[in-house]
Amino acid sequence: MDGCHLSRDKLQGDGEGCDLKTSDYLKKYGVRLKKHLGQVFLSDDRIAKRIVKAAELTPEDVVVEIGAGAGTLTEELAKTGARVIAYEIDESLAPILQERLSKYPNVELRFEDFLKAKNVPEGAICVSNIPYNITGPLMEKIIEWKFKRAIVMIQKEVGERILAKPGKKTYGYLSVVVQTFYEVKKLFDVSRSCFVPNPEVDSTVVDLKRKPVDLDFEKFKKFVSMIFAKKRKTLKNNLRPFLSIFEGVDLSRRAEQLTVEEIVELYEKWRRALECSRG
């Protein structure tokens, strides 16, 4: 089978025979890709359809897409009848998006930087092909805006970090902050040949479902950053300014050896102690 094709675990291909609409649109409007934006556009409708199917959207849902690009995924989202709010920072893509989406009254295009967005509806569903160059900050924004669910396509390496378990080399800050607030499940891998232009790495689609967790995210990520600041050092080293708070706690282990639950327990102890010290 030519082009991007579906194997058991991975959508892949040789780059020929993929849906060429993305390339055609870019040529039609003379759009030049901007490297500093990490622009990698999905070019296979079948992948978009599979992602949207996994989201199980209804017309009552509000969907946020981060990085609409050339609109391949946006158009499939629009077909569900859900209210779609699509963010795109590159206004040169406006003619493409307007041509592809003008017949869908349920789509709202916002040409702005999602990282600076002020009025994102909380409790919405995020379905996106996340821009590679800002994956970490965008994952934090997904947590901050309390999306009840997120189905996102990200670099395979980042997917491995998000899914990592304690003791694994890839387990770290991103693993902990995402897994604290979301149940995380890998859906499938996507070959680099199914994008325009072809990136240097493959991608992974993950499904995040919000947990009923009530934590101050800003304080929590500060604590997690602190214990992972020097990954090979023990908790005793990384928490040295706060040793009195953790009297009686075994701090001989490294953060990468702790479960998410153990880290949350340490955080709560740290948070309560700081609040008491401030009166």
Swiss-Prot record:
<dbReference type="Pfam" id="PF00398">
    <property type="entry name" value="RrnaAD"/>
</dbReference>
<dbReference type="GO" id="GO:0003723">
    <property type="term" value="F:RNA binding"/>
</dbReference>
<keyword id="KW-0698">rRNA processing</keyword>
<keyword id="KW-0963">Cytoplasm</keyword>
<dbReference type="GO" id="GO:0031167">
    <property type="term" value="P:rRNA methylation"/>
</dbReference>
<feature type="binding site">
    <location>
        <position position="42"/>
    </location>
    <ligand>
        <name>S-adenosyl-L-methionine</name>
    </ligand>
</feature>
<protein>
    <recommendedName>
        <fullName>Ribosomal RNA small subunit methyltransferase A</fullName>
        <ecNumber>2.1.1.182</ecNumber>
    </recommendedName>
</protein>
<feature type="binding site">
    <location>
        <position position="67"/>
    </location>
    <ligand>
        <name>S-adenosyl-L-methionine</name>
    </ligand>
</feature>
<feature type="binding site">
    <location>
        <position position="113"/>
    </location>
    <ligand>
        <name>S-adenosyl-L-methionine</name>
    </ligand>
</feature>
<dbReference type="InterPro" id="IPR023165">
    <property type="entry name" value="rRNA_Ade_diMease-like_C"/>
</dbReference>
<dbReference type="InterPro" id="IPR029063">
    <property type="entry name" value="SAM-dependent_MTases_sf"/>
</dbReference>
<comment type="function">
    <text>Specifically dimethylates two adjacent adenosines (A1518 and A1519) in the loop of a conserved hairpin near the 3'-end of 16S rRNA in the 30S particle. May play a critical role in biogenesis of 30S subunits.</text>
</comment>
<dbReference type="GO" id="GO:0052908">
    <property type="term" value="F:16S rRNA (adenine(1518)-N(6)/adenine(1519)-N(6))-dimethyltransferase activity"/>
</dbReference>
<keyword id="KW-0694">RNA-binding</keyword>
<comment type="similarity">
    <text>Belongs to the class I-like SAM-binding methyltransferase superfamily. rRNA adenine N(6)-methyltransferase family. RsmA subfamily.</text>
</comment>
<keyword id="KW-0489">Methyltransferase</keyword>
<dbReference type="InterPro" id="IPR020598">
    <property type="entry name" value="rRNA_Ade_methylase_Trfase_N"/>
</dbReference>
<dbReference type="InterPro" id="IPR020596">
    <property type="entry name" value="rRNA_Ade_Mease_Trfase_CS"/>
</dbReference>
<dbReference type="InterPro" id="IPR001737">
    <property type="entry name" value="KsgA/Erm"/>
</dbReference>
<keyword id="KW-0808">Transferase</keyword>
<feature type="binding site">
    <location>
        <position position="129"/>
    </location>
    <ligand>
        <name>S-adenosyl-L-methionine</name>
    </ligand>
</feature>
<dbReference type="GO" id="GO:0005829">
    <property type="term" value="C:cytosol"/>
</dbReference>
<dbReference type="GO" id="GO:0000179">
    <property type="term" value="F:rRNA (adenine-N6,N6-)-dimethyltransferase activity"/>
</dbReference>
<keyword id="KW-0949">S-adenosyl-L-methionine</keyword>
<feature type="binding site">
    <location>
        <position position="88"/>
    </location>
    <ligand>
        <name>S-adenosyl-L-methionine</name>
    </ligand>
</feature>
<dbReference type="InterPro" id="IPR011530">
    <property type="entry name" value="rRNA_adenine_dimethylase"/>
</dbReference>
